[in-house]
Structure formats: C-alpha cells, structure tokens
Amino acid sequence: MGSGGTGLLGTEWPLPLLLLFIMGGEALDSPPQILVHPQDQLLQGSGPAKMRCRSSGQPPPTIRWLLNGQPLSMATPDLHYLLPDGTLLLHRPSVQGRPQDDQNILSAILGVYTCEASNRLGTAVSRGARLSVAVLQEDFQIQPRDTVAVVGESLVLECGPPWGYPKPSVSWWKDGKPLVLQPGRRTVSGDSLMVSRAEKNDSGTYMCMATNNAGQRESRAARVSIQESQDHKEHLELLAVRIQLENVTLLNPEPVKGPKPGPSVWLSWKVSGPAAPAESYTALFRTQRSPRDQGSPWTEVLLRGLQSAKLGGLHWGQDYEFKVRPSSGRARGPDSNVLLLRLPEQVPSAPPQGVTLRSGNGSVFVSWAPPPAESHNGVIRGYQVWSLGNASLPAANWTVVGEQTQLEIATRLPGSYCVQVAAVTGAGAGELSTPVCLLLEQAMEQSARDPRKHVPWTLEQLRATLRRPEVIASSAVLLWLLLLGITVCIYRRRKAGVHLGPGLYRYTSEDAILKHRMDHSDSPWLADTWRSTSGSRDLSSSSSLSSRLGLDPRDPLEGRRSLISWDPRSPGVPLLPDTSTFYGSLIAEQPSSPPVRPSPKTPAARRFPSKLAGTSSPWASSDSLCSRRGLCSPRMSLTPTEAWKAKKKQELHQANSSPLLRGSHPMEIWAWELGSRASKNLSQSPGPNSGSPGEAPRAVVSWRAVGPQLHRNSSELASRPLPPTPLSLRGASSHDPQSQCVEKLQAPSSDPLPAAPLSVLNSSRPSSPQASFLSCPSPSSSNLSSSSLSSLEEEEDQDSVLTPEEVALCLELSDGEETPTNSVSPMPRAPSPPTTYGYISIPTCSGLADMGRAGGGVGSEVGNLLYPPRPCPTPTPSEGSLANGWGSASEDNVPSARASLVSSSDGSFLADTHFARALAVAVDSFGLSLDPREADCVFTDASSPPSPRGDLSLTRSFSLPLWEWRPDWLEDAEISHTQRLGRGLPPWPPDSRASSQRSWLTGAVPKAGDSS
C-alpha cells in the first residue's frame, strides 16, 4: 500500500485500538454474583464458627456482612473477624457471672447473618444464615423428689431442666437405664413423669436428664417406693362418700422467661357423706370434640388438696370435661359430677415444621408441616407465608387457608428467595419458622454447573442474557471489527483503482499488452539499462558513434535502469486493449557502406546560401531539431502483406490493434544536405580509418516508446515488421551546384490517404566542402501509416556531427526567417488528433547530399518524392528541451540522449500545443518513430487477424523484409563492433551476419533505368 495505506495504518489505527482496548476492558467487567452462600451455624465448644461466602465479579467485589439486616461492626475482633477471602469467623464469648448476663452477651452475636458483595456494577446479597449458640446451664430448675406410692395409685415425678439454647430435651432414666414409656400408664407431660395405677415393679431410682447441643445434664436421683394397699374395709367406706365438683376456674399464666407453660385451672369440690374423708383425690379430664364423639379416654391427675387443687397439662383452645374421684389406698370412691370448660385459643407456640423450597417452571414451591399438636393452642385455621425482601423479590406475604401446607410463588428474575411460615389460629399467627432461602441461578450458570441437566431457554432468559454487559460489549467489539474490515476493503479497492486511471502513467506491475506484444525471438530491443549522466553535455564534443553501443565510462553505475523489462512473457495472458501506452522499441544497426554516386537523373535540390552552410546546418523547422541523416541505398522488396504472411500472423500488427488516424496537416518530408560533394576530394571515399568529419561508421535507426518507466517484470512488446524506408533518389553530379532532395509517398490505389503531388525544390548556392543544406518541412508531423515503422537507411558510410554553431543557428531561427525555397503545397490530408504523431519518414542527409551532387532533372523516382519546403522558426520550449537530447546524441552519447528524451516526456510538455511537432522532431533526430495510440479494444483470439494494411504495398522493387531479431542481438553486435574497432579492423567482416544484414539494408545502387 502506498502513502495512503501508511497513513491508514499509522494514523487511524491508534484510535480503533484504543476503543477496542476500552471496550475490551468493559467486556471483562461483570456485576457481582454470590457463588457460595452462608449456612446456618451453631457455636459449640471452644472453636469459632465460620460463615463462608464466595462471590464473583469484575472488578473483584467487596464483601460485607450484615446481622439482622444491619451492617456488622468489626470493632470487636474477639467476637467477629473477617478473613481476606470473605469468610467471617465468629468466636464464642466467655460465659461468666449470672445466666442473665450470659444471655445478654450471646444475644449480641446471635441472629441471621447475610453476605453482601458489591462493586461498581451492582450489589448481590446472599441468603440468610442463622447463628445459634449451644448453651446448657448446670442447675436444674426443679429436681425430682422421693415419693412413696400405693399400688394402684398414680405417681408423678416432676423435673425442671436447666436453661439452655437450644432448649434441652428431657428424658427419664430408671435404675441407670432409659425408662420405657407406656401410653396410658407411663407418660411424660411437659418435663414430668406420670405413672398411672402404680405397680409394685414401679419402685426404683428415677433420674431426669436434660440434653442439647451444648451437652447434657443429670438431675439428682429420686427414690420411688410402691406399697401395698390398706384393708378392704376402707374401700367399702369410700363407697358411701359423695364428691360434688363445684367450680373449674382458668388461671392466668404467670410471666416466665422462655417457653410459655400451658394453661392451668383451679378445681374446687365438696365432700359429703357419713364416712370419713378420703386420703387423696384424683382429677379426671378429657377433651370434648363433638357431641356425637364418644370422647377420648380420661386423663387422671393426682390432686394435692382435700377440697381444691390446681390442675395443669391442658391446651389452649380445647373444650375439656372435668371430674374428681376420691381414693384411699387401693379403695376408690365414686366420681363427682362433670363440668365443662372451654379454654380460649392462643397463637401457636411452635412454628410449622419441615419448611422447604424448590424451584419449578418459573415459580418457587413452598411446603411445610403443621406444628406439633401440643403447640397448636387452638384450631389451626391456616398459615401465613412471609417473603423476605431482597434484590430479586420485594417483601410480601401470602395466606394459606385451611389445612393446605403448600404454596406456589411466581418468580420473575433469578436471585435469592427467602421465606418464613407461621401457623394461624383464632388468636393470630404464631411463631415464625426459620428463614429458608433458595437461589435461582440463570440458565447459563446452571447449565455450566450441571451440564447433564439441560434447561431450555425461554424468551425471558434470552432477553436477560442479551442484556448482560459482557454480551453487549462483545457484540460492540465484533461490530466495530466488522466495520473496520469493511473500511479497509473499501480503501484498498479505491487505492487500487487509482493505478488504473487513464494517461501515460497507467502502468501496473503486470502489463498484459506488453506481455502479449513482445517476443524475444522476433523483436530487437534496447539495452537492458539506459545510462544517462546528469547535466548537459558540451555540444562541441565529438566522438565515434561506436561509443554509443558500449559502456560509457562517464555514466555512473547508479544510473537509471531501463524502462523495458526483459522478464519472460507469462503464458496465457489475455489480450487486452492498451489505450495509454506507446509501442516498444526496435533498434536496427546499419553497417557502414561506401558512398555511392547519385544518379544523374536525380533532380537538384534547392540549397541554402553559403553563409549558412559554412557555419552550421540550418534549423529544419519549428517541428523538428537539426539532424543529419544519410539516405539509404535502395531496399529489398518485401511488402507488409508478404511479411505478414511469412510470419504466419504471429506478430501483433500495430494497425490491427489501433485505429487508423488521419493527419491534420499535409504530409511533409524533411531533408538535410550535408554539403556539396562536387569537389573531387569529397566524391572520393575515405579510408576506413581516415576519421574524416564526413565519415560515419554506422547509423542507428530506432523506434522506441517515450513514456513512463515500465515495471521490471513487464513483458516485451510484440515485434513488428519494419516498413520500407523512403525512396532514395540520385541527384545531379557532385560538381553541379544545384542539388535536389525529392521524395514522395508511394501508396497503392487502395490506400485511403490521397497521394501527395510531386514537389520539386530548387535552390542554388555556392558549393562548399563543409556546407550543409537542409530543406525544411511543414510544421506538422506526418501520419502516413499506423501499421508500420519508419526505418532510415544509410546510403553513405558517414555520420555527421553538428557543431555548436550549427545547433545555435538552429535554435536562433524564428518564424519570420524562411529559407529561399520554391514551395509547392502538398495535397492536404485528413486531420489527425493532436495526440497522434503519425509516421515520420525522412531521408538521411548523406543521401540528400548525393542527390545534390547528382543534379539533373527528375526521373521516375522523382515522382515518388515529396519535399514541401517551409521556414525554420525558433523552436518552442518543448523543442528546446528535446534539443538537449538530440544534442547529446550528436555527441555520441546515446544513453544520455535517451534519458534527456524521456525526461522531456515526463509530462511537462503535455499541455504544450507544440508537443506534437517537438516530439516528432526529436524522434526523427534519433531515427525514432512513434505510433499512434491504439483504440480501446479487446482481442479475443491469441492470433492476430489480418492486418488492415496488408494490401498496402510500397515500391515493388524497394521494400524491406521482415526482421527477425534475438533479444541479445544488440549486445552481440556491440561487443563484436567494439572488438573489431579496437583491433583496427573494419566495423563489419565481409562474411559476418552483420554484413548480410547490411546488404539487406543497403542493397545495390539502383540504376538510372530502375527508377520505375
């Protein structure tokens, strides 16, 4: 990615990363949850009790304990101590002094404990846990006493256990063994032992034992003796005694601490009869259930009085029947009358038993068992259920009527549910049961804890899950990442689309057009690198042209790399249109050839005045730079159609891949004349090593692309057949001062372009050995054909180098300074777009010089030449930029000239209106030719269709065959040429391949009669 990508990664990344960091941190935070709830504990022994509480959450929650709903103070570490993990240690206080003081101290730590975990996201409260302290004092409240009983009588042993928590249970032992109770004869009422109809075997030692979690306590041993009854006479006397029960009165209970005792009644009776009073009286009572009910068995209680006594062991809310019976020993008297007494109801003295909670389908089921019968204190009319207020459920109560012992509570949110149950009588609700709690976990937590138990998700559970902070944070992070990825993709697509825009700089790493159009075996190419030196070169320096082919020691090693890549073409590359590139380069090195005398039929060309010829070559026009070219000898005949067929249509012809663009200006031919060759010494051919100024070992005819630098792995351009060069005509003899350079375009009748009329230019001037003459073309570039390349061939083995004066003269010419020429306006052609530079074909200067020496009229070849004259104005800035490249080429510095030409084509002249002319002049100065842009089209077949220029035939006798080159041909030629020059040998051996190529290029000098 380019700088935009760097900016994206370097500038836009920190903000998303910071947001992800913050949101990720929030995603880890969670509200507190109670994992381990405290359990009921009992302080016993000397060790402390532990209330455990575990919670989870992020940040880690703070644990706080509450006692009976109030925050627990940690100011007394001897009673409470909080461990770092949240566990609460409860120490048992030391019991000293009176029991009353001990109870006050214990009440400070007894109660219901709850654990509260809180952080910045919320608070969680655990279920309540009750702390109990097991206490059992030493002293019994009532000790059993020694008793003497008579067989058949009732026996009561009273026992008051010591105070303790929990309330101690009382059991009786006889002779060191637990006493076996017998319903109806041996029963325990309260804490007292009652024996009805005592028997002889009931005698023994009885002991009361109190037991709770704190331990057990034993009372003193009481001795019981059962004696035989008195004489039978006493029994008969008792039958005459009459007992009248007068009153049964309910006694008010005395305020006592601890469990409330049952109700008591006061019985009063009256004895009548002749017999003596009885020794003892027994009270009998039973509960009355209904009139139709036969009633329960009577309960006998021995009274301690003779006319009145207190009777206990009753229950509130019951209807009782009372009566009194006298007795003396084993003798019993008749029973008294029966009195009815209804005891009022009281609140139940005991809570319901077995309270449980279980979760159901969106509800909690509460179930319980009735309290013990002796603690009903009336008729149980229903139950009251209280719910402790917490975060899950507010405080509420429900009433269950009748004997139902179950309640269903609807739940809305997960959490902790704690309930208490109390029995209700006519007097009200009794004692509450111990709080029982149930924790309802969420579905995910429950499934995680117990994977085997699958709980189906409901809509409420799904909503609760989606509302959790971690789920919301995770969703936000995923959404942000998705948006970030979409943004990056859009950015990359738009960034990649910039490289495919129109213009010259549209090259990518893999140019499919170049891959398809280049073949190492068919097309020559430029050297691998173009070395150029920074700065301009002195235009006055001169060197051999052979230095262009070798390494220039003045060029630095870090010079620019070639614009062309020699990477092999990738197979299977589709044929795509190329609407913004020039075509590739072809370099043909033409070997030197001896000068050939011009034909006497060649018409004389118009010459410049001697004052111009003596100093420098005149500037051609505002469309071109001063150049010196030699005319090539006649070419071998091979039309593009034949070349196309010979190559079996393997080359992608330029005319097939781009539309034919018509020129906007008339066709013009430029000609330069090196100088008069009328003198004898000039007409003679110099030696190979003479080194004369007029000698040129070779000429380079090249055509290459001027455009942006291609990627190194771009494939080679497709090779094209070289078109025939313009016809070389012979002028008058070298002694004739009037030399003419005439050239015309030859086109078949099928050519859509109109044929240019014959133009003969005549000019006279004094001959000079060093004079150079030029016939200037019109300011427009020619556009002969878009299907062939321009090739320039030398006729003379000379390469002239301009002097600084000549270059300066060319640059100083203005539009108003015209050379004396006879202008013949050529036939106008169809206009071409300004961006199309057309086909430029010029003869070499040496050829023009030969034609000037030949003199004479115009033969058959004259009709094929066209030399429209024009003035030579001062070049535009774009032309001046390109002139630097041409000047470098004149000084044997082809790499620098190439770099100058490319640098002048980097886009600075794209807005110049003279760009077409300047580029044509510069290209023509180097022997280059540019093809028009191809139209946007897509080739569907790998083989090119027939060229639309296939029928365009050039001269029947002068045409150029299809050149087949190897990619390393130029390097081999350079090495061979340099080695031969270093050894003093001719540039080309007679039997070498270069000679054959040279013969191809130069050919034989046509005779005067072959002009047709």
Curated annotation (Swiss-Prot):
It holds the Pfam family Ig_3. Residues 32-132, 138-225 form the Ig-like C2-type domain. GO terms for molecular function: signaling receptor activity. Belongs to the immunoglobulin superfamily. ROBO family. Interacts with SLIT2 and ENAH. Residues 534-550, 745-759, 772-791 have a biased composition (Low complexity). Residues 1-27 form the signal peptide. InterPro entries: FN3_dom (IPR003961), FN3_sf (IPR036116), Ig-like_dom (IPR007110), Ig-like_dom_sf (IPR036179), Ig-like_fold (IPR013783), Ig_I-set (IPR013098), Ig_sub (IPR003599), Ig_sub2 (IPR003598). Disulfide bonds join C53-C115, C159-C208. One of its GO terms (biological process) is establishment of endothelial barrier. Residues 249-346, 348-443 form the Fibronectin type-III domain. GO terms for cellular component: external side of plasma membrane; membrane. Residues 760-771 have a biased composition (Polar residues). It comes from the Eukaryota. This is Roundabout homolog 4. Gene3D superfamilies: Immunoglobulins. Keywords: Angiogenesis, Developmental protein, Differentiation, Disulfide bond, Glycoprotein, Immunoglobulin domain, Phosphoprotein, Receptor, Repeat, Signal. Expressed specifically in embryo and adult vascular endothelium. Residues 533-553, 586-616, 711-801, 980-1012 are annotated as: Disordered. The modification Phosphoserine is found at S814, S947. It comes from Mus musculus. Disruption phenotype: Homozygous knockout mice exhibit a complex cardiovascular phenotype that includes a combination of aortic valve thickening with or without bicuspid aortic valve, aortic valve stenosis, regurgitation and/or ascending aortic aneurysm. In general, these phenotypes are observed with low penetrance and male predominance. Receptor for Slit proteins, at least for SLIT2, and seems to be involved in angiogenesis and vascular patterning. May mediate the inhibition of primary endothelial cell migration by Slit proteins. Involved in the maintenance of endothelial barrier organization and function.
